[in-house]
Amino acid sequence: MEGIIIKGIGGFYYIKTDEGIIECKARGKFRYNSLKPMVGDRVTIKVENGKGVIEDIHERSSELIRPTVANVTQAFVVFAIKNPDINLDLLNRFLTLCEYNDIHAVVCLNKEDLCTEEEKENLKELINDIGYEVLFINAKEGKGFDALKERLEHNITVLCGPSGAGKSTLLNSFIDREHMETGSVSEKIGRGKHTTRHSELIDVDNGYLVDTPGFTTLDVTFIDRDSLKYCFPEFNDYNNLCKFNGCNHYKEPKCAVKEAVEEGKINKLRYEFYIKTLEEIINRRGN
C-alpha cells in the first residue's frame, strides 16, 4: 500500500492512503541507513495485525531541512506590502532558497488595501522582471483566496515569509474551510487551532499545504559559489554569453550579466544582493 506522510511525531507517522489515515512506525533499516522519514515523503507501507510499518521511502524531488519537509513543489512567499514594509533583502533570501531547492515560488503581497494602484503596479513590475508571479491578497478579508486555491492542485505548497506578514491568517482560512469538510481527519491526527510545533500536510483542493513552525534559518551561504548564479532566474539568458566559461559575474571581465545590469536589463538591487551573498559565501569558506 502506498501513501504520503502528512504528520510525524514521537516516532509515529501518519500516512494518508486510499484507505484512510494509517498510523505507522518506520523500519529500523532507515535508521541504519541514516534515512529518516519526513513529512511529504511518498512511502510504501505494510499493515499487519492492525499495525502499520513504513517499508520503503520513495525518491524525493526536494528536501527542506528547516522546516523538515520533502517533495515541496511550490512556495507562497508571503510579505506584507506595508506594516511592516517589504524587506527586499529578506524576500531575496526566500527566493534564493526556493530556486536552490527547485521550488516554484509565487510572491503573495498581503495587506494590498494599504497601497495605491500605482504602488502595486511598480511592485508587480519589479517582481515580474526578476521572473516571479505576484498575487495581491488581503488575508483577513479573503481577497485573492481563490487565486491561491487554483495554484494548490497537484502541489505540495509551503507558506513562508517574515513574522507579521499574514501567513497564520492565510493558513487558518484554509484550515477553517477544510475542517468543516474533513473534521474527522483533523481529529485523527490531533490538529487543533493553532500552535505549530511540527510540520504537517493539510489536504486542500487536490493538493497539500504545509503547516510548519517556519523557516528557522535563512542562511544561504551553504550554497556553492559556482551554483549561486543559477538561483537568479534573470541571469539565465546571460550565463552562457560571458567571455569566460564558469563566469560568476563578479570580478571577471567581459561579463554579460554585468553588462545587462549596466544597460538596465537586470535589476541593479538584485545584482547587488547577488554580489553580497557571493562575498558572504567566499568569506565563509575562504575560497
Swiss-Prot record:
One of its GO terms (biological process) is ribosomal small subunit biogenesis. Disulfide bonds: none annotated. Binds 1 zinc ion per subunit. It is an enzyme of class 3 (hydrolase). Its cofactor is Zn(2+). InterPro entries: G_CP_dom, NA-bd_OB-fold, P-loop_NTPase, Ribosome_biogen_GTPase_RsgA, RsgA_GTPase_dom, RsgA_N. Residues 61-218 form the CP-type G domain. Keywords: Cytoplasm, GTP-binding, Hydrolase, Metal-binding, Nucleotide-binding, Ribosome biogenesis, RNA-binding, rRNA-binding, Zinc. Zn(2+) binds at C242, C247, H249, C255. One of its GO terms (molecular function) is metal ion binding. Its EC number is 3.6.1.-. Its main location: cytoplasm. It is found in: Cytoplasm. Pfam families: RsgA_GTPase, RsgA_N. GTP binds at N110, K111, E112, D113, G161, P162, S163, G164, A165, G166, K167, S168, T169. One of several proteins that assist in the late maturation steps of the functional core of the 30S ribosomal subunit. Helps release RbfA from mature subunits. May play a role in the assembly of ribosomal proteins into the subunit. Circularly permuted GTPase that catalyzes slow GTP hydrolysis, GTPase activity is stimulated by the 30S ribosomal subunit. NCBIfam families: ribosome small subunit-dependent GTPase A. Monomer. Associates with 30S ribosomal subunit, binds 16S rRNA. Belongs to the TRAFAC class YlqF/YawG GTPase family. RsgA subfamily. This is Small ribosomal subunit biogenesis GTPase RsgA. It comes from Clostridium perfringens (strain 13 / Type A).
